[in-house]
Design a protein with these regions (language model features):
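Short beta-strand elements of ligand-binding domains
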Residues: 114-115, 141-147, 295-298
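Glycine-rich, Arg-bearing micro-motifs that act as flexible, cationic patches
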Residues: 110-132, 160, 263-288
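Structural beta-alpha unit
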Residues: 1, 14, 62, 66, ...
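General small-molecule cofactor/ligand-binding pocket signal
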Residues: 34-36, 89-93, 142, 192-194, ...
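Structured core of small recognition/catalytic domains
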Residues: 189-266, 277
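Small/aliphatic-rich secondary-structure junction motif
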Residues: 1-56, 159-211, 233, 240-241, ...
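Short, structured interface segments
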Residues: 130-151
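A short acidic, glycine-rich active-site loop
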Residues: 55-70, 211-221
Length: 300
């Protein structure tokens, strides 16, 4: 049986955007789609209804469950209408959202989540469930933001933009590049590999630096990046791969290149310690500020 693409849904606009993106991804992968709604609320007789207006008044847990079932049914029907022929299943499960979603991701090709909109500060904010879930699963996790305007069901296949991938040539990049090339091959688009760098302060201020040193470092990074891409270029000869070695903070450079991307892929190192962060600063910044869907790929 083909593993599904799993998407977490709760009825909010972010999860609806995630469900639509996940459905299109499932079609590309020729995989079934699984919608999961997690009952993650306090166990009290009465509580505010999730997804309802603040002045809707308290409702019981059973009514919340009926509301969740209605959301699942409505979203399932909408996906089937927009993507006829796609196999869709839905399930409602109790528990803590991040933990349940991580378990559901274990037998999936991919987990897709909605990412919240703008917060009080400039830029987007990633919800705590998204951050926690990314750190709990080795399955690729894609965070999707809602479009500013509703996206109609496509009448015909549209051309895809590039898949942008942030590459640190000092890290193990096989899983990350493999994901990026595979996604680009499915879409018939290019891969744009981005590495941002700057000289350590030990080299002194730029005006005092021998230009030859800067060029030597840049050439070394470009060679390392090209070497990382070489085996994937051979494996996916139909995928055009572009290299971007840019001076500046890596997160800033990836975000700049991602502005016109169809999908952005970043890596995260698997950390087995029970405490501490599970996201590096580049992945963290891209997740919070990129407008395109962001895929987080775990690696050792």
């Amino acid at each position: 049986m083909t593993p599904p693409v799993t998407v977490g849904v709760d009825g909010f606009p972010e999860s609806r955007a995630a469900a639509d993106w996940a459905a299109r991804e499932a079609v590309l992968r020729e995989a079934p789609l699984r919608l999961v709604h997690v009952e993650d609320w306090p166990h009290t007789p009465f509580m505010p209804a999730v997804g309802q207006l603040e002045n809707a008044g308290p409702v019981g847990a059973e009514e919340l469950r009926r509301g969740a079932d209605a959301v699942l049914e409505e979203m399932t029907d909408d996906v089937r209408r927009r993507h006829p022929g796609l196999q869709v299943s839905a399930r409602r499960m109790p528990g803590r959202a991040a933990a349940v979603l991580a378990v559901q991701a274990a037998d999936s090709q991919m987990l897709v989540l909605g990412s919240r909109g703008r917060g009080a500060v400039e830029g987007f904010l990633l919800g705590s469930v998204g951050i926690a879930t990314v750190g709990l699963t080795a399955t690729p996790v894609v965070l999707v933001r809602p479009p500013r305007e509703p996206v109609p069901a496509p009448a015909a296949p549209a051309a895809y933009r590039d898949v942008v991938v942030g590459v640190d040539v000092r890290e193990d990049t096989d899983a990350l590049l493999g994901f990026a090339f595979e996604e680009a091959a499915r879409r018939g688009c290019a891969v744009r590999a981005v590495h941002g760098w700057s000289l350590p302060f030990a080299f002194g201020y730029a005006p005092q630096l021998d230009p030859g040193v800067r060029q030597e470092v840049a050439d070394g990074i470009a060679e390392a990046l090209s070497e990382r891409l070489s085996s994937w270029r051979r494996r996916y000869p139909s995928v055009k791969a572009e290299e971007r070695v840019l001076v500046g903070a890596p997160a800033v450079q990836v975000l700049y290149e991602a502005a016109d991307a169809d999908l952005v892929a970043v890596g995260r190192r698997i950390r087995r310690a029970p405490v501490g962060g599970h996201l590096g600063h580049v992945a963290h910044a891209v997740l919070h500020h990129a407008t395109a869907p962001v895929a987080v790929i775990a690696h050792d």
